Each structure stands twice: as structure tokens, then as C-alpha cells.
Amino acid sequence: MSSTLDVKLNRIDRIFHPHEIVQGQVIISSPKGFSHQGLAMKVEGSARMQLSTKGAGLFESFYNNVAPLELVYFHLPVAPAGKVPPGITKFPFEFELQGNDGQELLETYHGVYVSVKYEIVCDCIRGIMKNKLHKTLEFVVEVPLREPLLDSPEEFHITPESLENVRPSLSAMPYFHITGKVHRTNCPVNLPFTGEIIIEEAKSPIKSVELQLIRVESVAHADGVVRDATEIQNVQIGWGDVCRQMAIPIYMIFPRLFTCPTMLTPAFKVEFETNIVVLFENGNMITENFPITLYR
């Protein structure tokens, strides 16, 4: 059995806020023990960006590399050179979570063209003939607002006359009248997105009613800004030719890590939208778009 190194934090969910104290242990398990040249830890956090090939083109996205935004970077000595005895040995550590030189921390986010990650990297250098022990552990940073935003509910009415960007071939589609409301367009990221939709009237049979969550990521580069929208998730809230004049609940949980509070920085933006989509059996589809602001 070979020696192993692991990093454990004092919080199971590994969620921390700016300026909190992060505590944990480096745990080394060794059947025979060994000598080492020190136990070192590195804490790093950065926002990494890349250009969309669709928005910037394949050539531009390959050669216009966008430098990452460094948020946190420091080294932390855990133990000096010495010996690890046989069995399990634990080395405690702690540090304050704060940005470099007054840099504000951004919330953890795993996107397509923008990602914000925070990691603890721990290395134990052993003798010349032995491989070093290495462990990388990601932890999550949440950045709450001091005051909540107003809910800003919004009602909607959809008829053939209210549609925009309609192909000429669909201008004579059968009549429909759809109403509804969303309870918040300023949404706490830890609460569900809710509302209701009512099919007041529809001459054509309906196939499904769906709710889409969209991320809109914008990345600045030397020649301008590349903006790209991608789907995070799609929730079916109605199946088949749904009943007319009956409220269909809108309910969607914002997925952890793949969503975050709306971020607007000089280097990039991460924004969110929801689409209510009604798909008819004849293949026609209508979409109502709601830009939303997420906050914690």
C-alpha cells in the first residue's frame, strides 16, 4: 500500500464567504513512514475566459488568448521538513479568505466561456527516489449582497399580433392567446424561479410547454466583446395538449455552480435569461423571453 495525501476542510459543503477563516487538515496516510522536505500549500482563485468560436471565429478564438483574472494567490507553509511516522498523521491549517491587494472576490461559477474557481493545492516533496504526494481540492466561494433587490414581477400576454421576428410563412398561423406572470425578475439564486402560465385559447393542438434557463456570457478582448448565449437546462412544465384556461405552475431550481449572481466586470459579464416555450404539434414554436438578475 502506497502513501497518500488528502485535504479535508472543516465544512462538509466547502462553502465560504469573503474574509471568513478557512480551516482544515492535511491528512497523510503511510504504512511505513517517510522523510520529507516540507509540506507546502498554495491557495489560488481565478476567473478564466475563452472566446466563443461562434462569436469570434475559429482563428480569432485560437490566437486571441484572454488572460485570466487572478483573484487569490498565496503560499502557506503547513509543516517544515521532517519525518512522517507510520499510520495516519494530520497537519492542521487555516487562512483568511481574501483577494489579492484589495481585489474583490467573485462567486464560484462553472460556465462555458467563463469560469471562476478556487482551489487548495498541497504538495509533499519526498526523497529523490520517491514521487511527491499531491492533492488539489476545489472549494466554493459565495458572495452575498448586503441588501436584497426588489422582486420586480412581470406579467405577459402572447397573441399572434404580439410576436416579433416571425417568419412570413408563419404569419397566418392559427389563433392563440397565452397569459401568465413570473413572480420575480430579480431572483435570489437560492430560491426557485416561480410563476404561472395560462393557455387561454389555442386553435392548434399543443405538444409541450417548456421553461429554459439561458446563460449569456460576454468576454472582452482586443477587438471588442464576444457575447454568446447557451442553454443551462430545460424543464418541461406541460406535456401534450394542455387544458385551456388553467394555470400551469412555473417552478425551476437554479442549479448550483452552473448559475451564480449576475456578474458585470470590465473583463467579462455573466447574465441570465429564461424562455417560456410553447411548442405546437404542427411544429410551430413561440417563445417569451425574460432577462433576469440573480443575486444572493
Task: List the predicted regions and their residue ranges.
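C-terminal beta-sandwich interaction modules and adjacent acidic
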Residues: M1-R296
